[in-house]
């Protein structure tokens, strides 16, 4: 792929523009008044939003889509002719942006090669934007979206008007991206396909490191190598020493490269730069006293639940102090942050049943989310975990870990595996995972499809239940159907 990105007015065409990562980039480019087009086989509210700001969206993927900003040719034309499609020459060829999910058989991808279009991975575009700004890039196996969104919100509330690119939708800016008018950029930096190594921000954050994405990585050591390369490119590195792997990486960065490093921890005895005491996690939020190099800064209040979100907030505190904010400004921004969508998101309440949507799909994330749910649950209230496994490779790799992740749930409802495009090799199934979980947790029910999940829950949810829909697939599509059906004899709070 061509790594050179032209922000000088040359068009961008995104293959699969409706994806959460692709659409955020397209939004920022379109808001910068650059020509943007894209295709997606499943138009959604995100593609409609892009259309509203001037992007042209195709609902089919075909070669002729690439000529939208060139001369108009028929979509039925068989022969691709660069001179006919782009009479002003190759300088008008669009820059074609794709993600790892796009394979070489894609018609638009093949046409881009034949026409000689510059082909960019989405990480190339993000890396170029990171280089264009005073940038903060948030990396880590878990907590990237919440941490980057929180930092973005904090800077926004402090009047710094940042550009923000994250992997989830945030109500504060009604989407997964916003274009600011200041030199600041906050971005979520994804490690799933190894492209994290392309980013060289002024401030880099590593929240934690674990093995994940077994479709790309075989060992934890391979994951660490990617984060080490990312760390080398950061002018200043911030990380949590509560993760042993991050702690070692920070130590190496500080000693071998004399790189400025800033550390944070939930434990005051770690000698981290930012620590907390007096932690109080309650159903309505989390508070703690924040310390900076042994000096008390003040009390931090979060609307978000649990210790892992307090850790994310400490990363935000470190960034705020680094860019010159007073603690009062930092605390105000963090206190107002309500979280990102699909991150312990309240979706409704009907007949006393509370519905929560969460993106958790890794064993560690499930444990943390269910622990937060148990904290919020009232005495006697059931925590019902409805989980859709994500990818065959992840389910097989972490089979043992998944079986131990549901201890805080009173009832587990498991669906079949959401493939996310992976082939089913017959090595693992949702039913096998259910059987494995049942060895540790007796209250497990297997319901393979969204329709059977809905049927089961409508019959078995009780008033007072806290129902959590967990997974990175399409399980959350069942929530509106269940709420709507329950609403027929009652009134829901939405």
Curated annotation (Swiss-Prot):
One of its GO terms (molecular function) is ATP binding. Keywords: ATP-binding, Cell cycle, Cell division, Cell shape, Cell wall biogenesis/degradation, Cytoplasm, Ligase, Nucleotide-binding, Peptidoglycan synthesis. It catalyses: UDP-N-acetyl-alpha-D-muramate + L-alanine + ATP = UDP-N-acetyl-alpha-D-muramoyl-L-alanine + ADP + phosphate + H(+). It comes from the Bacteria. ATP binds at residues 140-146. Its EC number is 6.3.2.8. Pathway: Cell wall biogenesis; peptidoglycan biosynthesis. SUPFAM superfamilies: MurCD N-terminal domain (SSF51984), MurD-like peptide ligases, catalytic domain (SSF53623), MurD-like peptide ligases, peptide-binding domain (SSF53244). This is UDP-N-acetylmuramate--L-alanine ligase. It comes from Trichormus variabilis (strain ATCC 29413 / PCC 7937) (Anabaena variabilis).
């Amino acid at each position: 792929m061509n790594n050179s990105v032209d922000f000088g007015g040359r068009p961008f065409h995104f293959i699969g523009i409706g994806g959460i990562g692709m659409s955020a980039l397209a939004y920022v480019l379109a808001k910068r008044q650059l020509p943007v087009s894209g295709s997606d086989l499943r138009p959604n509210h995100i593609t409609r939003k892009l259309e509203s700001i001037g992007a042209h969206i195709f609902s089919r993927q075909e070669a002729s889509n690439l000529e939208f900003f060139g001369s108009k040719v028929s979509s039925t034309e068989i022969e691709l002719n660069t001179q006919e499609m782009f009479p002003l020459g190759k300088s008008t060829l669009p820059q074609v942006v794709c993600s790892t999910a796009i394979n070489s058989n894609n018609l638009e991808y093949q046409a881009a090669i034949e026409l000689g279009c510059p082909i960019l991975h989405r990480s190339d575009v993000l890396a170029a934007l990171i280089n264009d700004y005073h940038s903060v890039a948030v990396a880590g196996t878990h907590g990237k979206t919440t941490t980057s969104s929180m930092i973005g919100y904090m800077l926004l509330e402090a009047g710094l008007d940042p550009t923000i690119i994250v992997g989830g939708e945030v109500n504060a800016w009604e989407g997964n991206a916003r274009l600011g008018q200041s030199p600041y950029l906050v971005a979520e930096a994804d490690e799933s396909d190894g492209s994290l190594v392309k980013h060289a921000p002024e401030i880099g954050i590593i929240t934690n490191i674990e093995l994940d994405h077994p479709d790309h990585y075989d060992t934890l050591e391979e994951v660490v190598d990617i984060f080490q390369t990312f760390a080398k490119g950061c002018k200043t590195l911030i990380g949590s020493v509560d993760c042993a792997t991050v702690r070692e990486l920070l130590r190496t960065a500080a000693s071998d490269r004399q790189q400025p490093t800033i550390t944070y921890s939930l434990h005051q005895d770690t000698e981290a730069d930012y620590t907390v005491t007096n932690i109080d996690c309650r159903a309505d939020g989390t508070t703690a006293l924040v310390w900076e190099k042994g000096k008390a800064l003040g009390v931090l209040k979060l609307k978000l639940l649990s210790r892992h979100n307090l850790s994310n907030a400490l990363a935000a505190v470190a960034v705020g102090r680094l860019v010159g904010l007073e603690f009062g400004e930092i605390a105000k921004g963090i206190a107002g942050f309500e979280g990102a969508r699909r991150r312990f998101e309240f979706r409704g309440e009907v007949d006393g049943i509370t519905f929560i949507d969460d993106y958790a799909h890794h064993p560690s994330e499930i444990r943390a989310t269910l622990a937060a749910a148990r904290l919020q649950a009232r005495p006697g209230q059931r925590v019902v975990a409805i989980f859709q496994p994500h990818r065959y490779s992840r389910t097989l790799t972490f089979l043992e870990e998944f079986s131990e992740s549901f201890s805080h749930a009173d009832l587990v409802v498991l669906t079949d595996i959401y493939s996310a495009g992976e082939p089913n090799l017959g090595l693992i199934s949702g039913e096998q995972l259910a059987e494995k979980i049942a060895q540790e947790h007796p209250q497990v029910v297997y319901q393979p499809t969204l329709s059977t999940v809905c049927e089961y829950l409508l019959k078995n949810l009780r008033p007072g239940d806290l129902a959590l829909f967990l997974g990175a697939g399409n399980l959350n599509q069942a929530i509106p159907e269940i709420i709507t059906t329950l609403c027929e004899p009652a009134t829901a709070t939405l």
